[in-house]
Amino acid sequence: MEKIAFLGLGHMGEPMARHLLAAGHPLVVWNRTAAKAGPLVAAGARATADPADAVRDADVVITMLAGPEAVREIADAILPALRPGAHWVEMSTVGPDTVRELGERMPAGVTLVDAPVMGSTDKAAAGRLGILAGGDAAGVEHILARFGPVTRTGAPGTGAALKLVVNTAVIGGVALVAEAMKLADALGLAEGTARDALAGGPLGGAVARAFAEGVHFGSDLAVKDITLATESARLPAMEAVLGHFAAAAADPDVVHEDIARAVTHIRARRDA
């Protein structure tokens, strides 16, 4: 069975790595905050303080990191240590430009797959994430399936591109629901009445996400993803949405909370 190195044990990475252990894969893990590896080590993984050491003997390297800068930094550390025949599966939300940069830096014989995920911590724990796999994923599709259904998106970078499209729609929908609820507040409507009416219409999915519980996607991550999207195309509506989430991310009580918390923040804003 393939030896796997998993780098990044945050809200998403830790439960994903558990599925690999449960499947019997020899697993080496690394995280910038080393203490987060403790529960996985107790479950049978090996932890290392050096990301290069983590990947040196790995057949498959999986990265689940905060964003493009973190991925570039880890690339500097691990690229010299990747062995020929290995696959690097980049599962962070970084956009297609970063994937192209990484592809240009791949050592001979190493395959890069961009495979960001759809879903939050609840789906990560349940193994029901949606995997958007770009590039030559044939050699790792069975491993990606440990996390949930795999959609092959095409050429390298297309998984990262489609993830930006999906997140733009989700984040924009949440902001739209927040503004609709702000209007309901201004017009004196009962929250439950407005929420139920919205939930019963075409925006039902966005309403469910705007008021979701038990999931985690922080306003800081929303800002990162919207920024990537608005750098790729002119998106006036999403530029306005970026203002909402940037304000939420500037609030230390909200920045790392799920975007459902940002809905309350948007409804309460007096400057927008």
Predicted regions span which residues?
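Rossmann-like NAD(P)(H) cofactor-binding subdomain of soluble oxidoreductases
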Residues: A34, P51-L129
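NAD(P)+-binding Rossmann beta1-loop-alpha1 motif at the extreme N-terminus of oxidoreductases
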Residues: M1-I62, E101, T121, T151
